[in-house]
Amino acid sequence: MSPKTETKASVGFKAGVKDYRLTYYTPEYQTKDTDILAAFRVTPQPGVPPEEAGAAVAAESSTGTWTTVWTDGLTSLDRYKGRCYDIEPVPGEESQFIAYVAYPLDLFEEGSVTNLFTSIVGNVFGFKALRALRLEDLRIPPSYSKTFQGPPHGIQVERDKLNKYGRPLLGCTIKPKLGLSAKNYGRAVYECLRGGLDFTKDDENVNSQPFMRWRDRFVFCAEALNKAQAETGEIKGHYLNATAGTCEEMMKRAIFARELGVPIVMHDYLTGGFTANTSLAHYCRDNGLLLHIHRAMHAVIDRQRNHGMHFRVLAKALRMSGGDHIHAGTVVGKLEGERDVTLGFVDLLRDDFIEKDRSRGIYFTQDWVSMPGVLPVASGGIHVWHMPALTEIFGDDSVLQFGGGTLGHPWGNAPGAVANRVAVEACVQARNEGRDLAREGNEVIREAAKWSPELAAACEVWKEIKFEFETIDYL
């Protein structure tokens, strides 16, 4: 370690304020396999040098504070401090750069996303010397990821539980999202599952409101999926949202879902919090429940290019905290999602080993070792004409979820489900026969519609529907 950056008690205490870069900017540092690495997009205030801003991020997210303190001499800062070890400019942005920071593993509690984020994305994001700060990516070493349980079950176990292979799974969010009685809600669930969907879903807003208390909804939905299973011979599921105002209430709802014998529950992991989510994920593994995760509130955190946190970081955090599904955008629907960026974090959710690839926004090679993968869920403004693109973009290990694209069918809920099931089966068959879905997708749908009146009606209704807006977050 360079003498310039070494801190020893024998040097003696000198009160006052000194530049962060004297202690926390260490370009000669060689990162360790056990370090947690972070890539920050930094926009410093005018007059603040990049090295000082990067060092300030490292300091304020680890051991530093605004002034020298005498208790620095009672510990080894060289062992515990974060280090800004590299800085690179952001192409096309004169006032921005990427600061790379290495954190020693001992700074973080084992198995706690809450503690990890409290440091790395804590008070440093309000630091006055920075105009804006965004966490673009994290490298989680196996020595830390192995302290987490991760997803309750993972992709392969879920397929085995459902006995469904070789195609994307199909879902539907029940609409209107608020206002239905529990019995009418259960009726919609039954019709969608009976029509051919694998899952239906509580909207993230649905908890336990006066128009539909949670226990009534759970009972009617369980009745609906049992009836649909008996009639179709397929295993069905409904994402019963266990999110609640307290952890105790959340667990009470999850326990009741297990007693009903349903296969899957749901949690809003950002509004509910990582501590609650991890607790629920542990319960789900111990009790055989799959766990669907909704990302409500994510755009507040990740949508701005210059400040906040990229969704790929939230995706990694969810994989550690625990979830078998997570919403991941659609690329083609109504919600934000650029193709290369989306495919980058989809790989981070599903794969065991992901190479660094800046063209897809992946700043670090990530090795998840044996941690199970998470199914990405494509949901938001999608319909049957999107099916070829969704099948081509997301592949088999995904959930394609059509809310309005099922319930908005002119003939009703069950025909809407039939249309989606026929469309996905046609796309998978065409792909397996070697056809190019990106080029021939519309023709594949038209051919299938000739022998499926439900699909033909859906194609006619949504033939002009598009969501063509420029993506805000891009590489």
From Swiss-Prot:
Additional comment: The basic functional RuBisCO is composed of a large chain homodimer in a 'head-to-tail' conformation. In form I RuBisCO this homodimer is arranged in a barrel-like tetramer with the small subunits forming a tetrameric 'cap' on each end of the 'barrel'.
Catalytic activity: 2 (2R)-3-phosphoglycerate + 2 H(+) = D-ribulose 1,5-bisphosphate + CO2 + H2O; D-ribulose 1,5-bisphosphate + O2 = 2-phosphoglycolate + (2R)-3-phosphoglycerate + 2 H(+)
UniProt cofactor note: Binds 1 Mg(2+) ion per subunit.
Any single GO BP term: reductive pentose-phosphate cycle
Modification N-acetylproline, positions: P3
Name of this protein: Ribulose bisphosphate carboxylase large chain
The gene coding this protein: rbcL
PROSITE patterns: RUBISCO_LARGE
Any one GO MF annotation of this record: monooxygenase activity
PTM section of the record: The disulfide bond which can form in the large chain dimeric partners within the hexadecamer appears to be associated with oxidative stress and protein turnover.
Subcellular location: Plastid, Chloroplast
Propeptide residues per the UniProt entry: 1-2
One protein family per Pfam: RuBisCO_large
N6,N6,N6-trimethyllysine modification, residue list: K14
Major enzyme class: lyase
Cofactor: Mg(2+)
